[in-house]
């Protein structure tokens, strides 16, 4: 949704804002003053991205396209487990994407959902369970290969990081929410394992999470994650709401979010990468982000033909559910 390009990537969006304010205020002077004020505020509160050399160590180590195992490779092993991390390394992944959530007593653990029902033999919201209760659950209980992983437990963030470092894997920390808690927990992890500054990245669908992370530690490499129409439609394209007016409201919000992501929020947060749903990635799309000094990582790329296309034709790193075979995407 770029209007036109300039070196900083802000000419297009602020020209649009100026025109919009001209229409609303009907005063060239007021429109110029308001637009200038918004621009100065953005520049004042925005963060500089980390040096591109450091970011590329994570995104394209050894100057090659990276294959990142989604949730550790959720098709090949129980997702977000130490077994998944080990399998990802064994199967040739460059790195892993891991989801961070918190127990009721504030322990950061690996979990994608806000409930434990889908992946474990337990039930209930994770935020209502203590770490001691969570530790008793079996995260392999509902996996297709559960018999091959009988002794898995939900790992802590620290345990997962230690395992990844043992296998020389880059890490994409996917933060689901709790901006303050997550940024504090990750800051502690980065202080304990300073090598993470050069082989990991924090990413989120939520701009407030990334902004808080940059506030907490500006040396951390960050990325925004995005899927167009995510507020109004599920991952498989179905409308989220049956009521027409409600669905329409969220469609409008999706348009605003998409425009903000591509035109303002990337600059405000000072990101180094943009994680985009694969169906919206094209050579032209990559070129536009590259002009801003930002790498695109595509998700979720799950067939051999798609992987070959992203590696050979696009030269784009990608996230996949399986390093071994074709599989359906996990949203």
Swiss-Prot record:
Domain GP-PDE: 65-331
Enzyme class: hydrolase
4Fe-4S in keyword set: no
Domain of life: Eukaryota
GO-annotated molecular function: glycerophosphodiester phosphodiesterase activity; glycerophosphoinositol glycerophosphodiesterase activity; lysophospholipase activity; metal ion binding; phosphoric diester hydrolase activity
Catalyzed reactions: sn-glycero-3-phospho-1D-myo-inositol + H2O = myo-inositol + sn-glycerol 3-phosphate + H(+); 1-O-(1Z-octadecenyl)-sn-glycero-3-phospho-(N-5Z,8Z,11Z,14Z-eicosatetraenoyl)-ethanolamine + H2O = 1-O-(1Z-octadecenyl)-sn-glycero-3-phosphate + N-(5Z,8Z,11Z,14Z-eicosatetraenoyl)-ethanolamine + H(+); 1-O-(1Z-octadecenyl)-sn-glycero-3-phospho-(N-9Z-octadecenoyl)-ethanolamine + H2O = 1-O-(1Z-octadecenyl)-sn-glycero-3-phosphate + N-(9Z-octadecenoyl) ethanolamine + H(+); 1-O-(1Z-octadecenyl)-sn-glycero-3-phospho-N-hexadecanoyl-ethanolamine + H2O = 1-O-(1Z-octadecenyl)-sn-glycero-3-phosphate + N-hexadecanoylethanolamine + H(+)
Required cofactor names: Mg(2+)
UniProt subunit comment: Interacts with PRAF2. Interacts with RGS16.
Mechanisms controlling activity: Inhibited by EDTA, calcium chloride, and zinc chloride. Enhanced by magnesium chloride. Glycerophosphodiester phosphodiesterase activity can be modulated by G-protein signaling pathways.
Post-translational modification: N-glycosylated.
Similarity comment: Belongs to the glycerophosphoryl diester phosphodiesterase family.
Protein source organism: Rattus norvegicus (Rat)
Tissue specificity remark: Detected in heart, brain, lung, liver, skeletal muscle, kidney, pituitary and testis.
Gene Ontology biological-process entries: ethanolamine metabolic process; G protein-coupled receptor signaling pathway; N-acylethanolamine metabolic process; phospholipid metabolic process
UniProt-annotated glycosylation sites, renumbered to this chain: 168
Lumenal-side positions: 25-248
UniProt: Mg(2+) binding residues: 97, 99, 174
GO cellular component, one term: plasma membrane
Membrane topology reported for the UniProt record: Multi-pass membrane protein
Protein name: Glycerophosphodiester phosphodiesterase 1
Job description of the protein: Hydrolyzes the phosphodiester bond of glycerophosphodiesters such as glycerophosphoinositol (GroPIns) and glycerophosphoethanolamine (GroPEth), to yield a glycerol phosphate and an alcohol. Hydrolyzes glycerophospho-N-acylethanolamines to N-acylethanolamines in the brain and participates in bioactive N-acylethanolamine biosynthesis such as anandamide (an endocannabinoid), N-palmitoylethanolamine (an anti-inflammatory), and N-oleoylethanolamine (an anorexic).
InterPro entries: GP_PDE_dom, PLC-like_Pdiesterase_TIM-brl
Cellular localization per UniProt: Cell membrane; Cytoplasmic vesicle membrane
Residues that span the membrane, as ranges: 4-24, 249-269
Keyword annotations: Cell membrane, Cytoplasmic vesicle, Glycoprotein, Hydrolase, Lipid metabolism, Magnesium, Membrane, Metal-binding, Transmembrane, Transmembrane helix
């Amino acid at each position: 949704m770029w209007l036109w390009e300039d070196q900083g990537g802000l000419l297009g969006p602020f020209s649009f804002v100026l025109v919009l304010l001209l229409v609303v205020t009907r005063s060239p002077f007021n429109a110029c003053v308001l637009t200038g004020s918004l621009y100065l505020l953005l520049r004042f509160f925005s963060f500089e991205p980390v040096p591109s050399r450091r970011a590329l160590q994570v995104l394209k180590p050894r100057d090659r396209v990276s294959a990142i195992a989604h949730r550790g490779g959720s098709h090949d092993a129980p997702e977000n487990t130490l077994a998944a991390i080990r399998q990802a390394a064994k199967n040739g992944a460059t790195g892993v994407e891991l989801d961070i959530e918190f127990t009721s007593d504030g322990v950061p653990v690996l979990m994608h959902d806000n409930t434990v029902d889908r992946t474990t033999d337990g039930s209930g919201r994770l935020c209502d369970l203590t770490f001691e209760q969570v530790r008793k659950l079996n995260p392999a209980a509902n996996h297709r290969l559960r018999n091959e992983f009988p002794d898995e437990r939900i790992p802590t963030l620290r345990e997962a990081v230690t395992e990844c470092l043992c296998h020389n894997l880059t890490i994409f920390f996917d933060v689901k929410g709790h901006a303050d808690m997550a940024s504090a927990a990750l800051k502690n992890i980065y202080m304990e394992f300073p090598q993470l500054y050069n082989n990991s990245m924090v990413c989120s669908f939520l701009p407030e999470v990334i902004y808080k992370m940059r506030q907490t530690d500006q040396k951390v490499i960050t990325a925004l994650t995005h899927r167009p129409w995510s507020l109004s439609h599920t991952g498989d394209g179905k409308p989220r709401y049956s009521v027409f007016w409600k669905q329409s409201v969220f469609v409008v919000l999706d348009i605003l979010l998409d425009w903000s992501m591509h035109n303002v929020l990337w600059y405000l947060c000072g990101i180094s990468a943009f994680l985009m749903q694969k169906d919206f990635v094209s050579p032209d799309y990559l070129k536009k982000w590259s002009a801003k000094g930002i790498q695109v990582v595509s998700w979720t790329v799950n067939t051999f033909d798609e992987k070959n296309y992203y590696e050979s034709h696009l030269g784009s790193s990608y996230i996949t559910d399986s390093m071994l075979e074709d599989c359906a995407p996990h949203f």
